[in-house]
Amino acid sequence: MNAHSSLLPICKKATAHIAFSKAPSGISYVSRQEVGYPFHLGRTLKLPQDPPGMAAIYLQSCSGGLFAGETLHLQLHAGPHTQVHVSTGAATVAHSMLEQPARQTVTLIAETGALLEYLPMATILFPQARLHSVVNVTLHPNARVMLCDAFCLHVPPGSAGLPGFYRADLHIRCPAGTLLAGDRLALTGADLQRRLPGVSAELQALATFMLVGQDLPVDELKRALRDALRVVPESYLGVSALPNDCGVSVRIMTADAVALRSALHLAWACARQQLTGIAPRVRRK
């Protein structure tokens, strides 16, 4: 895993490509799946308090997390007028990385009229973890995308130290490739250890949540999200409009993973309520 042997296999690439279509009955379904190790795709679920016809799937890792030198690529393609919810069955562990960092790239394509929710659980950063997370969104007319990118820290018994770094790059583009909005985050373990007031203080779990789409009632969404998140204790919260009329962004920082998960559910439930009129219940995982 992290041995110093020169024979260690690194720079491994793994890909999962999942596409969704809408049946004549109105039900969304998985119409294509090419899923390689370490990804595992569960069966499609129909969950209570989801919009009618929505397909819900859970991705899992068969390898036990992210390791040094890995390059993972996940592509989700929501066809016209589909409704799709994608999450993970558990949090992903980014293990200590002594040789090389890991990279995870997620490509989200939402075609005309689609609703695509990509809401994985937070990544858990172990000491010396070094992870670069990239999310690329292609937004077609009248499409809506909900997404989050989140991490928290954990030191297993018998271990010590800080994460190396967490870097996140997010790009939202139109089908022609024009950049509509971008977000960039870079933090090191040393940054968090400083615990600067107004920057991170004692907080060690961070998430970015976005509702992406054009012609949304942005001011109404910002008010609703701020009201929904007021109840989150001991947190830093920020809600802002994305440029080029492409949605709303929420930054959340909390003391731990439990509070972060609760805050992300509140943000998701609020956004889903505003879009569909139906708020989702808390999912047991």
From Swiss-Prot:
Keyword set includes RNA-binding = no
- GO MF annotations, alphabetized: nickel cation binding
From the Swiss-Prot or TrEMBL record, state where the protein is found. Answer: Cytoplasm
Entry-linked Pfam families: UreD
Q: Say yes or no: keyword Cytoplasm present.
A: yes
For this record, the Gene Ontology CC terms, alphabetical, are:
cytoplasm
**Which keywords label this protein?**
Chaperone, Cytoplasm, Nickel insertion
Relate the assembly described in the record.
UreD, UreF and UreG form a complex that acts as a GTP-hydrolysis-dependent molecular chaperone, activating the urease apoprotein by helping to assemble the nickel containing metallocenter of UreC. The UreE protein probably delivers the nickel.
Family (UniProt):
Belongs to the UreD family.
> Which HAMAP family does its entry note?
UreD (MF_01384)
Outline what the protein does: Required for maturation of urease via the functional incorporation of the urease nickel metallocenter.
Q: What is this protein called?
A: Urease accessory protein UreD 1
